[in-house]
């Protein structure tokens, strides 16, 4: 079983989701299945089948989170000797030199990456392009959308 790097915050988020799925969602689904069963014939009972499908998805996500936690290699960026470099877990303020747009990314593991939340996978094109760089470095990163040019404005370890 290969260990996967994850931030402390990412692990806590997964643990919170696991508690929610087990302690709140699971009982709600069981109640919905019970209610649907009381309506009679299960073959044509859409509510029953929908609840069973939801149960399957919920149990699948619980198993997935348990697996992620079992494989987790928690990296606390605040305890690492970082020397001002972009490393796993660091938060990076960038300026897109092509558009002038300012953006902040946090470099994270596969299971916590979420582009909408500006959490980028350390092995993504942008993650790979930033790791090891320093504040004020100019970086050219090849992405699926084309080449992007950034200046690293700040690196934080929070």
List the model feature ranges, each with a label:
Residues 18, 22-25, 69-73, 95, ...:
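Conserved NTP-handling cores and scaffolds of large molecular machines
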Residues 3, 155-158:
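Short hydrophobic/aromatic patches at helix-to-coil boundaries
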Residues 1, 16, 37, 69-70, ...:
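Residue-level signal for pocket-adjacent positions within structured domains
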Residues 1-63:
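N-terminal cationic and glycine-rich segments that engage phosphates or anionic surfaces
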Residues 75-150, 156:
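Non-DNA-binding regulatory cores of transcription-related proteins
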Residues 52-55, 68, 140-142, 149-151:
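Generic alpha-helical hydrophobic packing signal
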Residues 61-80:
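Structured, basic alpha/beta domains of bacterial-type, RNA-associated proteins
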């Amino acid at each position: 079983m290969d260990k996967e790097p994850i931030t402390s915050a990412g692990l806590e988020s997964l643990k919170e989701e696991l508690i929610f799925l087990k302690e709140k969602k699971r009982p709600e689904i069981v109640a919905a299945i019970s209610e649907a069963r009381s309506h009679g014939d299960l073959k044509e009972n859409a509510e029953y089948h929908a609840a069973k499908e939801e149960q399957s998805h919920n149990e699948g996500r619980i198993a997935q989170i348990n697996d992620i936690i079992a494989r987790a290699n928690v990296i606390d960026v605040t305890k690492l000797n970082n020397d001002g470099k972009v490393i796993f877990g660091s938060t990076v303020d960038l300026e897109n030199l092509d558009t002038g747009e300012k953006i902040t990314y946090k470099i994270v593991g596969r299971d916590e990456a979420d582009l909408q939340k500006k959490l980028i996978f350390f092995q993504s094109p942008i993650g790979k392009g930033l790791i090891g760089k320093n504040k004020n470095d100019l970086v050219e990163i090849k992405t699926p959308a084309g080449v992007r040019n950034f200046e690293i404005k700040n690196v934080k370890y929070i």
